[in-house]
């Protein structure tokens, strides 16, 4: 690319001499008129070659150099396998297990929402449930009848499953090869005749289809264990320690409360929004999260291309309350003092109800209390269950900064090899000496601009975690 100007000059000379019959006189005339500027033109050409070389380095530094330094496609395959391993590990944590019980609920969700919606930090949520700072994932009732007797309610609870039934054959995975689920490597299932982009898409779809099938098998295994425990307790009259007694079932569900978001019935107490005191089940709470990184409409023109925007203006807006739209959504939870069961509590099978009074239903709303600040020690916020939100924001800023640097390099490269440069060369060749100063200054500006972007992109590549990019203003 650095030799482009010289090549264009040679072609221009050839075209001029061909049109004029190869006259040596014409060529000598042009040569003599340009003798004074030949030295300066050579210097300008050298500067242009350096500048265009910088463009090449800038365009390749974001991809080729990193690929070479990390082993190219082998590195990308390792990264893909590691991501798959983490996704599978997360899905395994979402399996409901009968022995992982807290106060009559569980550490994993019932399954009212799809896997894509359950992208919270599972260890963090499970820790909050064990600490009794967040309500457990209760198995919900589709309906609740105030007229149910104790025996009827216990029978309904006995019929509940650990997890909602899965869709066996989702339409999106129809015809997708699964292979041997016991073999982790799925590259052999990918059609190698496809383009690289299509191969990546197919690989992602195969992985998701296999993961869906694995989740079904994992949960079916736990469901079978749970059913066997129930049958054994019915046959012998001795319940497993993790199975709730009839008193526990009665006390849990006799005052069922409806979640105003999913409209399912759950045992009380439930989580309560910190701002407007509305009840919300844990499975609905973990769906609520910050907006994806975006630009503020007040500071950035929406019509402006993303690569022209300042990456530091990219923001992540805190989640708002789904009931009253208060920012920094969070909940509080007051665990039942007389029903500490399961992990860090007594065996659910030995629970005995403190009283046998008939169920009472609140006819008056609970007394109001003031809201609690989002940074209060008793509040669990949406950000707490997704602690990597700031890292994701910085990654998006880094990605945008790299795109902007590449776009600038391409723009500068196009200006260096402007077609107008060759068209006007023969007309202005005689006056090259007078225009050299301005051309040299322009090329120097290009070179300085590219050096800045090369250095910026180099910093981004040297620090993959984007610590070199200032986080800028972050909404909390």
Curated annotation (Swiss-Prot):
<dbReference type="GO" id="GO:0005737">
    <property type="term" value="C:cytoplasm"/>
</dbReference>
<comment type="function">
    <text>May negatively regulate the SNF1 kinase.</text>
</comment>
<feature type="region of interest" description="Disordered">
    <location>
        <begin position="351"/>
        <end position="379"/>
    </location>
</feature>
<feature type="compositionally biased region" description="Low complexity">
    <location>
        <begin position="28"/>
        <end position="45"/>
    </location>
</feature>
<dbReference type="InterPro" id="IPR039301">
    <property type="entry name" value="Sip5/DA2"/>
</dbReference>
<keyword id="KW-0963">Cytoplasm</keyword>
<protein>
    <recommendedName>
        <fullName>Protein SIP5</fullName>
    </recommendedName>
</protein>
<feature type="compositionally biased region" description="Basic and acidic residues">
    <location>
        <begin position="358"/>
        <end position="377"/>
    </location>
</feature>
<feature type="region of interest" description="Disordered">
    <location>
        <begin position="1"/>
        <end position="48"/>
    </location>
</feature>
<comment type="similarity">
    <text>Belongs to the SIP5 family.</text>
</comment>
<dbReference type="GO" id="GO:0042149">
    <property type="term" value="P:cellular response to glucose starvation"/>
</dbReference>
């Amino acid at each position: 690319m650095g030799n482009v100007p010289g090549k264009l000059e040679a072609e221009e000379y050839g075209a001029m001499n061909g049109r004029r019959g190869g006259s040596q006189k014409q060529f000598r005339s042009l040569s003599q008129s340009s003798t004074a500027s030949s030295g300066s033109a050579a210097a300008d050409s050298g500067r242009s070659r350096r500048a265009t070389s910088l463009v090449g380095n800038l365009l390749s530094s974001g991809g080729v150099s990193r690929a070479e330094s990390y082993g190219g496609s082998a590195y990308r395959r390792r990264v893909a396998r590691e991501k798959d391993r983490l996704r599978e590990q997360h899905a395994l944590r979402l399996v409901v297990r009968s022995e992982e019980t807290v106060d009559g609920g569980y550490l994993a969700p019932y399954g009212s929402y799809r896997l894509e919606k359950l992208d919270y930090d599972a260890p963090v949520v499970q820790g909050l449930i064990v600490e009794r700072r967040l309500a457990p994932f209760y198995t919900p009732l589709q309906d609740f009848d105030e007229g149910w007797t104790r025996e009827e309610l216990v029978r309904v609870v006995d019929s509940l499953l650990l997890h909602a039934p899965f869709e066996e054959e989702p339409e999106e995975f129809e015809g997708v090869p699964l292979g041997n689920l016991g073999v982790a490597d799925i590259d052999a299932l990918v059609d190698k005749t496809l383009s690289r982009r299509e191969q990546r898409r197919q690989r992602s779809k195969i992985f998701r289809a296999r993961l869906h099938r694995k989740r079904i098998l994992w949960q079916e295994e736990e469901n079978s264990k749970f059913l066997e425990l129930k049958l054994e307790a019915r046959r012998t009259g001795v319940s497993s320690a993790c199975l709730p007694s009839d008193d526990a079932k009665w006390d849990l569900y006799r005052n069922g409360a409806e979640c105003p978001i999913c409209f399912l019935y759950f045992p009380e107490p439930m989580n309560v929004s910190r701002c407007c005191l509305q009840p919300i089940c844990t499975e609905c709470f973990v769906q609520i999260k910050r907006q994806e990184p975006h630009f503020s409409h007040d500071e950035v023109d929406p019509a402006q291309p993303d690569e022209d925007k300042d990456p530091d203006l990219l923001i992540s807006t805190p989640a708002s309350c789904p009931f009253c739209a208060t920012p920094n959504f969070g909940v509080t939870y007051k665990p039942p003092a007389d029903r500490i069961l399961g992990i860090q509590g007594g065996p659910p099978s030995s629970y005995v109800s403190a009283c046998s009074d008939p169920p009472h239903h609140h006819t008056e709303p609970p007394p109001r209390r003031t809201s609690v600040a989002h940074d209060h020690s008793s509040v669990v916020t949406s950000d707490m269950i997704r602690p990597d939100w700031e890292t994701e924001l910085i990654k998006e800023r880094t990605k945008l900064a790299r795109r902007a640097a590449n776009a600038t390099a391409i723009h500068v490269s196009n200006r260096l090899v402007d077609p107008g440069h060759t068209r006007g060369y023969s007309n202005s060749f005689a006056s090259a000496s007078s225009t050299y100063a301005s051309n040299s200054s322009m090329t120097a500006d290009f070179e300085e601009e590219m050096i800045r972007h090369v250095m910026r992109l180099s910093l981004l590549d040297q620090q993959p975690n984007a610590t070199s990019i200032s986080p800028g203003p972050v909404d909390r």
